[in-house]
C-alpha cells in the first residue's frame, strides 16, 4: 500500500521504503496517529558509518515527525543505552513532550564490541534497549482530542 492509499482511506497502513525525511516532507500536517521507529544508535558499531550518521540527534528530522503526527499522537523511538539521552533531548527540542520510557529487557545482552587485535571485548554488554515515549502536545484538553 502507499501513503496516498492510507490518506484516502483505501488502506489502513503503508510500509514505505525510502529516505524518511524526504517521505515525511511529502505528507500533510497532522495525518499520522503514531510513529514507531528504530533510528541508528549513533555508536559507530563495528565501524559502520550508518550507525554514526547523526540521524537520531537531528532535531529537524524529529520536527517533521511532530508535524505529521495528530495532536496527542505518540512517538516511540528505540535508542542505544549509551546514546538514549541525546536522542531524547533532540526529540524534546523538536517540540515533543517526553512522557516516559520503556525498557525492553533481553534475556541476554547484545554482543560486545570486539577489537580482534586486543583479543578482548571493549564495551559493556547491555541487556536492555531503552525506548523514548513522547507525545505531540494536545490542542486543548485530553477529552477534546
Residue ranges and their predicted role:
Residues 2-145:
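Core catalytic lobe of class I
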Amino acid at each position: 500500500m502507499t501513503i496516498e492509499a492510507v490518506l484516502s482511506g483505501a488502506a489502513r497502513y503503508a510500509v514505505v521504503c525510502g529516505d524518511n525525511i524526504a517521505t515525511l516532507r511529502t505528507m500533510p500536517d497532522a495525518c499520522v496517529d503514531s510513529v514507531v521507529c528504530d533510528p541508528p544508535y549513533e555508536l559507530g558499531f563495528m565501524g559502520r558509518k550508518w550507525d554514526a550518521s547523526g540521524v537520531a540527534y537531528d532535531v529537524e528530522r524529529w520536527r517533521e515527525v511532530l508535524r505529521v503526527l495528530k495532536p496527542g499522537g505518540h512517538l516511540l523511538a528505540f535508542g542505544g543505552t549509551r546514546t538514549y539521552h541525546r536522542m531524547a533531548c533532540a526529540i524534546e527540542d523538536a517540540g515533543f513532550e517526553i512522557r516516559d520510557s520503556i525498557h525492553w529487557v533481553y534475556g541476554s545482552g547484545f554482543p560486545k564490541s570486539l577489537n580482534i587485535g586486543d583479543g578482548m571485548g571493549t564495551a559493556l554488554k547491555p541487556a536492555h534497549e531503552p525506548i523514548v515515549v513522547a507525545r505531540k502536545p494536545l490542542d486543548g484538553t485530553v477529552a477534546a482530542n
